[in-house]
Amino acid sequence: MKKITLILSAVAMFILSSCCPKAEDTFTLWQLPSQVNTIGNSYVIQTVNGKLIVMDGGSEEETEYLRGFISALGAEVEAWFISHPHDDHFWALINILKEPRDIKINNIYHSRITPETIETENGLSNQQVKELYAMFDNSPEYKVHDCHPGDEFEIDGVNFKILSEQNPELKYYNNQSMVIKMWDDSKSFVFLGDLGPEGGRKLMESEYMKDVKCDYLQMSHHGQDGCDKDFYMKAEFRACLWPTPSWVYNNDFGDGFNTGGLKTIEVREWIKEKGITENYISFEGLVRIK
């Protein structure tokens, strides 16, 4: 416990010394690094006036790092977005809701999947979603917003637009991912969550595909077996955010580069083919984009 406290204190000192809000005209985004080289999805945004926004938050193993990061930036989260209810995206939030300590959350934004969709995945995933929604339904401490495509709102100069919501006609929780665009006058991001090929095609055929145009695109499903090649080729973006552990990025389960059963190397080739060379990968460490 003493070692963990010292580590978190060091993280807090680093953030406060180098990342405190200044009189600048754009927000800051951090892509948080993998803590145990596992899949996860965790982004923290700070507005020019110090308001905090979290995208997903990551798996259970990410909890204490995320908690320390948020606390060092003031501990009050104005908005927490959940792309879809898989534990590698929301379990850190669950842990913080159960034991907030100094953290205060004001608003949670998500696209609630139907009871029928919940039952399409069995076992642990099914129970975790029910636990999450029970917490949402029974807490007066924060507001929960159920979002839909076309919803737009602004938080301290940062704009948001929902491009995709839960898709009950499609299989798999991944295809229920809420796609979020975030921007100001300086830069723009689109977060795809774990959107699958089917969900990507539905978005591509919708009126909101034009809004996918952005500077930074979060690669779907950790960069493999998410949106298909046609989606990435049609989307307009200049840089990639990879919430991806090393073994996924290299498709290496222990037998060497590209020896696993994942599609990451194929997706990486698509990105090269598109001419994009700016890639930010979570296993390589903390990324700060100003």
Enumerate the language-model features and the residues they cover.
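Active-site metal-binding motif and surrounding structural segment of the metallo-beta-lactamase
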Residues: 48-53, 60-111, 206-224, 236-241
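C-terminal motif of bacterial Sec signal peptides marking the signal peptidase cleavage site
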Residues: 16-18
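Positively charged n-region of N-terminal signal peptides that target proteins for export
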Residues: 1-4
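Core dinuclear metal-dependent hydrolase active-site scaffold
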Residues: 20-75, 140-213, 286-290
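Second-shell loop/turn segments in exported
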Residues: 31, 55-59, 79-83, 110, ...
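Binuclear metal-ion centers of metallo-dependent hydrolases, dominated by the metallo-beta-lactamase
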Residues: 107, 113-174, 239, 244-290
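Hydrophobic helical h-region of N-terminal Sec-dependent signal peptides
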Residues: 9-14
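Active-site environment of divalent metal-dependent phosphoester hydrolases
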Residues: 38-39, 60-62, 85-91, 114-118, ...
